[in-house]
A protein has these predicted regions:
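C-terminal catalytic/acceptor-binding lobe
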Residues: 166, 170-279, 292-293
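Short beta-strand-to-loop acidic/aromatic patch adjacent to the donor-nucleotide binding site
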Residues: 96-107
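Conserved donor NDP-sugar-binding/catalytic core segment of glycosyltransferases
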Residues: 106-144, 150, 181-184
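A conserved acidic beta->alpha catalytic loop
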Residues: 45-59, 107
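A short, glycine-/small-residue-rich helix N-cap motif at loop->alpha-helix starts
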Residues: 76-84, 89, 165-166
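Short, acidic, metal-binding catalytic loop of nucleotide-sugar glycosyltransferases
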Residues: 26-40
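Active-site nucleotide-sugar/metal-binding loop of Leloir-type enzymes
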Residues: 86-98
């Protein structure tokens, strides 16, 4: 983006909403009463095309008065919030100096919140920073992230797109801390009806483990952020040292993983009944399939480096999903043999054959018959063609 195209001091608010225009009315009222410079704030909202309730409210002009410029985007349902947020970011033209992600049930309580953000931005003249207001429901996570524009330009995403729910905010939070450009702001946000339930939440143990095992991706992103800061050699060295220290602490947390605790969290926070969570959902399935594929890819990279014990961690994570892949089990069998655990490998291999019978005897017969049929067909065609008389 050309520097001359950037609107200095402008804040772009990005929000997805569904089926609760009465909440938006309160959000808009709070925004109108607390914004110091409304001419420098824009609000972009994503509405699902099948959300008849919200669309009716828009058409009736019931949602016109937010005190700032409001931009609506009507689009298809997505498998995660990330897709809606990226759509709004692109549609905004990316010309704001600051971007903030909001929910449709959160109200600003701090007057002049926008000036607080602008003052923070001035402390990062390179435009690379991550900030977060106070969130009483999740004090240890960057729930409503505020991005300097060059942060987004550097990484080319708001969130990575891996997750159907949760984790995105924690993802960028860890990047910000590792890169040393994360700040908390004295801005108070309050949920309208207290902390609500989470849509799309299912299989939390798998997603929690997936998040832990993708730390290397976040480290790479933090390194990109540091590289883009144009630091002196001494500053860069200190920043990379800070990154490794934070990463080491995060790696220690991986060893404390508890699937029982994540099951408790799922039952506590999910919006859906057990029956709803077991129902097939194409969008969710694609997210999970992509995540499983990534875990297998990471395992293969470790195997190429002869790090078989590490590879098993990634393969075991796939077994926590709803998707069972024979390739993942075969790779684990290979890792176990490389580690000298042949009895365990043999047991797993037998279980694999029970689930996916190879039927080798029949396959050999069919291969032979197929070869005979192919060769016979070739001979017959050749014989017939050789017997034709030229015209």
């Amino acid at each position: 983006m050309n520097e001359s195209q950037i609107h200095r001091g402008e804040i772009c608010l990005i929000m997805a909403t569904r089926g609760r225009p009465e909440f938006l009315t309160e959000v808009f009222a709070a925004l109108k009463s607390t914004t110091a410079q409304p001419d420098k704030v824009s609000l972009w909202l994503y509405v699902d095309e099948d959300d008849a309730i919200t669309r009716k409210a828009i058409d009736s002009s019931a949602l016109n008065d937010a005190g700032v410029k409001v931009n609506w985007h009507i689009g298809p349902n997505t498998s995660g919030l990330c897709e809606t947020q990226h759509t709004l970011w692109r549609n905004s033209g990316k010309t704001a100096e600051i971007f903030m992600i909001l929910a449709d049930d959160i109200c600003f309580m701090t007057s002049g919140w926008d000036d607080i953000i602008r003052d923070t931005s001035k402390k990062f003249p390179n435009g690379i920073f991550l900030a977060c207001p106070y969130d009483p429901t999740s004090a240890d996570t960057c729930t409503y992230p505020i991005f300097g524009r060059r942060w987004l330009e550097t990484l080319q995403y708001i969130f990575p797109g891996h997750f159907p729910y949760w984790w995105d905010d924690r993802w960028v939070h860890q990047i910000g801390e590792m890169a040393g450009c994360y700040v908390r702001l004295p801005i108070d946000l309050r949920p309208i009806r207290g902390k609500g339930k989470t849509r799309r939440m299912r299989d939390l143990p798998f997603w929690a483990r997936f998040f832990q095992l993708t730390l290397d991706e976040r480290k790479d992103s933090a390194k990109k952020i540091i590289e883009a800061m144009n630091l002196t050699p001494e500053e860069k060295s200190a920043a990379l040292k800070n990154l490794e220290q934070h990463a080491t602490e995060l790696e220690k947390q991986q060893e404390k993983f508890s699937d029982l605790y994540t099951i408790f969290q799922e039952e506590r926070f999910t919006l859906h009944t057990p029956e709803e969570r077991r129902a097939f959902n194409p969008g969710y399935f694609k997210k999970e399939a992509d995540a499983v594929a990534l875990m297998i890819q990471f395992a293969q990279w470790r195997m190429a480096e002869k790090k078989f014990a590490d590879a098993i961690k990634f393969l075991d994570a796939t077994f926590m999903s709803n998707i069972r892949l024979r390739q993942a089990i075969d790779l684990k069998v290979q890792c176990l043999r490389e580690l000298g655990k042949n009895s365990e490998a043999d047991k797993l291999a037998k279980e694999t054959l029970a689930a996916w019978p190879e039927m080798n005897f029949f396959r050999r017969i069919f291969r032979f018959l197929g070869m005979v049929a192919t060769e016979g067909k070739t001979m017959i065609i050749g014989f017939l063609q050789s017997g034709k008389k030229p015209k």
